[in-house]
């Protein structure tokens, strides 16, 4: 069962990744919205939350936009996800807690929750950008591993 993230969370992740990948320039909200096919109004709300969290900065004026404000080696997936998601597993303590089965189930679910949090906390923006770069290079090489630029399709 894959992890399901809210639309706001995905927008936040896309925005942070886009800004961290372009540290030398400001990126407009419109550019991010266009690239990821996100509603500009929804993205604006997400960007405000990221600014409040001091993960990104808003740059006003000509050529303005947004830029990443954190240290990409220290900012983690959990830092961003926690802004938009309830990251705690809400296990309702039922009256059946006096049963071994209930206590065991709660323990296992808490352990799973802690593993997920530890994993999200261990993935930095820098490491995710490296994964993206690797995926981009695979796509450029094409399905047979040959570089798309050097394929025989373009030769006479």
Curated annotation (Swiss-Prot):
Residues 4-130 form the HTH rrf2-type domain. It comes from Rhodopseudomonas palustris (strain ATCC BAA-98 / CGA009). One of its GO terms (molecular function) is DNA-binding transcription factor activity. One of its GO terms (cellular component) is cytosol. This is Putative HTH-type transcriptional regulator BadM. Keywords: DNA-binding. Residues 145-156 have a biased composition (Low complexity). NCBIfam families: rrf2_super. InterPro entries: TR_Rrf2-type_CS, Tscrpt_reg_Rrf2, WH-like_DNA-bd_sf, WH_DNA-bd_sf. Pfam families: Rrf2. Residues 136-156 are annotated as: Disordered. PANTHER family: HTH-TYPE TRANSCRIPTIONAL REPRESSOR NSRR (PTHR33221:SF4), WINGED HELIX-TURN-HELIX TRANSCRIPTIONAL REGULATOR, RRF2 FAMILY (PTHR33221).
């Amino acid at each position: 069962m894959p992890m399901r993230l809210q639309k706001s969370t995905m927008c936040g992740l896309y925005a942070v990744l886009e800004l961290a990948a372009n540290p030398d320039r400001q990126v407009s909200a419109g550019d991010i919205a266009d690239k990821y096919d996100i509603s500009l109004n929804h993205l604006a709300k997400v960007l405000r939350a990221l600014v409040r969290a001091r993960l990104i900065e808003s740059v006003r004026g000509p050529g303005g936009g947004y830029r990443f404000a954190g240290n990409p080696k220290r900012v983690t997936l959990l830092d961003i996800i926690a802004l938009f998601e309830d990251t705690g597993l809400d296990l309702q303590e039922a009256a059946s807690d006096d049963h071994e089965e209930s206590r065991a189930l709660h323990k296992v679910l808490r352990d799973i929750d802690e593993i997920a949090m530890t994993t999200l906390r261990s993935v930095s923006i820098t490491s995710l950008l490296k994964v993206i770069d690797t995926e981009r290079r695979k796509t450029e090489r094409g399905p047979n591993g040959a570089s798309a630029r050097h394929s025989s399709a373009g030769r006479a």
